[in-house]
Amino acid sequence: MGNTTTKFRKALINGDENLACQIYENNPQLKESLDPNISYGEPYQHNTPLHYAARHGMNRILGTFLFGRDGNPNKRNVHNETSMHLLCMGPQIMISEGTLHPRLARPVEDDFRRADCLQMILQWKGAKLDQGEYERAAIDAVDNKKNTPLHYAAASGMKACVELLVKHGGDLFAENENRDTPCDCAEKQQHKDLALSLESQMVFSRDPEAEEIEAEYAALDKREPYEGLRPQDLRRLKDMLIVETADMLQAPLFTAEALLRAHDWDREKLLEAWMSNPENCCQRSGVQMPTPPPSGYNAWDTLPSPRTPRTTRSSVTSPDEISLSPGDLDTSLCDICMCSISVFEDPVDMPCGHDFCRGCWEAFLNLKIQEGEAHNIFCPAYECFQLVPVDVIESVVSKEMDKRYLQFDIKAFVENNPAIKWCPTAGCERAVRLTKQGSNPSGSDTLSFPLLRAPAVDCGKGHLFCWECLGEAHEPCDCQTWKNWLQKITEMKPEELVGVSEAYEDAANCLWLLTNSKPCANCKSPIQKNEGCNHMQCAKCKYDFCWICLEEWKKHSSSTGGYYRCTRYEVIQHVEEQSKEMTVEAEKKHKRFQELDRFMHYYTRYKNHEHSYQLEQRLLKTAKEKMEQLSRALKETEGGCPDTTFIEDAVHVLLKTRRILKCSYPYGFFLEPKSTKKEIFELMQTDLEMVTEDLAQKVNRPYLRTPRHKIIRAACLVQQKRQEFLASVARGVAPADSPDAPRRSFAGGTWDWEYLGFASPEYRRRHRQQRRRGDVHSLLSNPTDLDEPSESTFDLPEGSSGRRPGASVVSSASMSVLHSSSLRDYSPASRSANQDSLQALSSLDEDDPNILLAIQLSLQESGLDMDEETRDFLSNETSLGAIGSSLPSRLDSVPRSTESPRAALSSSELLELGDSLMRLGADSDPFSTDTLSSRPLSETRSDFCPSSSDLDSAGQDPSANDNLLGNIMAWFHDMNPQSIALIPPAATTEISAEPQLPCIRDGSEGVRDMELVPPEDSVSKDTGVHEGERAQMEENPLEENILAREELSQAGDSSNEAVGRGDRPDAASQTPQTSSDWLEQVHSV
């Protein structure tokens, strides 16, 4: 039994199918006990009988194992190979693994046998899986080298097996560990026909997204901003332009051509001149004013014909010429040769009416055409500036001369047309028309991007040149930049700068050593000090020296003048001079090598792209051959003729982009270093390089391994990136959708302070200087400063006030609160102290945010009375905390009880409060006792004293009515304890109750206060109005902000009117003028 099994195994290993079949058929016990899925062990690389049967292509034994003994072709050996891997290995691959059967020397027969075996493996069905399907042979199984059966079949050149694998869904794009596809494996083994067949199937493979990508490719606008024109295209373009212009002006073709030639073939320019003065336009062009045709006719019906009989003389003919050719004679004389013109001779009709014989006409026209003046041939009559029509020239000269005339005419058309230029390549008869000059603001056109100053154009034969200088194409560089780059290459001689990078690194290291280290005084080794004293010891030569003066340390003792003798100025200066010279020399060397290294960086990449461009130019020749080969190979397999022009299109896109990348490095070299413009340019340049290299890898290969739709998508992406790159350079390296620059300050510019929420520095500086000079009257008499729209207000439309909405109301409310607080704490004895404090406060800089916050917090904590409208507005304003402090950005409203709501003011309004403090401290007349005693007690009580009901309804805490200035100075003392020493404390002196003072009551601290309160009926009326408005606000919450602002404006106006009505004539007569003026100024603020 064991002997039979051993013989059978040896027959399988040696590939002797006849012996193996004889042993297997003659031993029933072996047939029953043999399992084709059991490994032979490690000595045999864990191959199974099925592996050996597939390796040698034993179709009879393989069929028996698969369908009779439940063999599994997915079993793997030690190399992770299945039976299909070994089956697809040809004789060339298996030579090194053992002896081969003699029939394997015949590869054709072996190919068919292996194809039959492969067909059996592909038809095999295993156990039933969970999904209801049966196990199949893994057609894309990979071994340890990541090879699939298709890799081995392609490398072996087994065409039948390759076709079977591809038909059953073998992966054409699978890559092994060497990143080779089955096509690459066939190419390496010189199976060219098989490689070409695999390439065609790879390129034209079907993919779900292929149709969508090809549809986008077909719809892609492939137009360029230029158009190459052949000679026939030039003639057609000229004729179309003449016909369209003649039809538009209702003029003959000859007249339209003359008009266009006189206006540089620019139809828009001609129409502009025609609309201004048609007669002058025709006179300057050398033609007569055309007669408008009758209705129902066009310009073609008005063309003169040489066969029509001559009409009467034109009115432009001179009297002398009329006398020389009288109309009553049957024959006329030629004005050149003075011979009679035969009646049998075909007449030459001219619009001017001059007669010449046909011989003179031919001689004259031949001479003009030979001289090259084909586009400005005037009538040969004396002082006649009538152009000779084209039909006259064609009817007189010979055919050869007519052909030459047409060439000169086309040449004149191109040279006089600024939008058309000839190709500068020698022997090229083509021209280029720049079809897109400038950008389209609408942005609907895909070619609406702006053109560069020196765009590159192509005549259609692959001749690229610059539109401006007619030299080598160099976009995105302009002509001057390109010239500077070529001059830079000539000066630098980069072929001699081979070791610049190494020299630059050496110079940089030398500069670093000189800057951060000192040489040892003995062995000159660089030493860097990072800790310790000035006593240094060289780690190399053990030399002790001083770090300061670099001399021996034994010189630093008490006997030599002290340890720190070297710290004297003379010694240090001497050492620094020596090191400074070395550092300056190293810096110069480093800077020079740095510039050289920078040039070599750009020059190296410039040459790399140039070399790649030269290599990829060869693809233009091979692309057509590749297209024919792919088309022929696919036609043999599928019978169709596919579109292969995408290969040539992709090569053209690659070459255009490669040329732009080559010239982009000179452009970047001359950009300003470390600028935003250069950073954006380099980012876009890198992005363009990435997509370009990706397309080059797909196209620049002997055999294409990328599907058609992926090549098309890569080419479209490169074209899109190229257009975006050029458009950005033409715009100055800025994205197309860049937003407007924010309102910020640049070098030499100014901030828009109101936009940022601050008062302008000019506004603050002017008020600070006035307060420091003590010019309080100029502050009081200059109310326009508060209303300047250019500095402290927003720009509002016409018809609205110049200041910000609600600013006047807030200022008025703040002033009234401030003045009432000052009136409570006022006393004659403390007036001078308060004035001194205010003058000291004015010496501080209100630009300091601490001052502004102090005033705001004082308003928040003072607990002063304010009406409901002002309370609602102040509670909704933005706090100064939003400008950088720790306060909240918006103050929450607080119920009106023992604590007043917080008032949030802007910086400009806080400055107005400071101005009011100065006015209150500097003006002493309104608070004189004579002024207060001159008014009756009843009037003063009605104007200044609140009723008991008002005080109870207010619910104020007596402790909240502190001095405003005291709160400011106390808070500022906590923030700046040193600066507050300059400010004298405010003295609080009690005053005795006198009968002439109005409504004096005792406070909680013994200080007598007085308040300005409106009459009771007005208070109750206003309270009712505010309650009704609050109820309406709750019903309409969306309109609360708008209504509040409108009511605040009306309340400000009504308060001014109430003040005006409160000044009765009798009171004004009894009060001095200074008091009334002061009160009016207080209320106006």
From Swiss-Prot:
Zn(2+) 2 binds at C352, H354, C379, C384. Zn(2+) 1 binds at C334, C337, C357, C360. A zinc finger (RING-type) spans 334-384, 520-549. Residues 926-959, 1068-1085 have a biased composition (Polar residues). Gene3D superfamilies: 1.20.120.1750, Ankyrin repeat-containing domain, Zinc/RING finger domain, C3HC4 (zinc finger). Belongs to the RBR family. This is Ankyrin repeat and IBR domain-containing protein 1. It comes from Mus musculus.
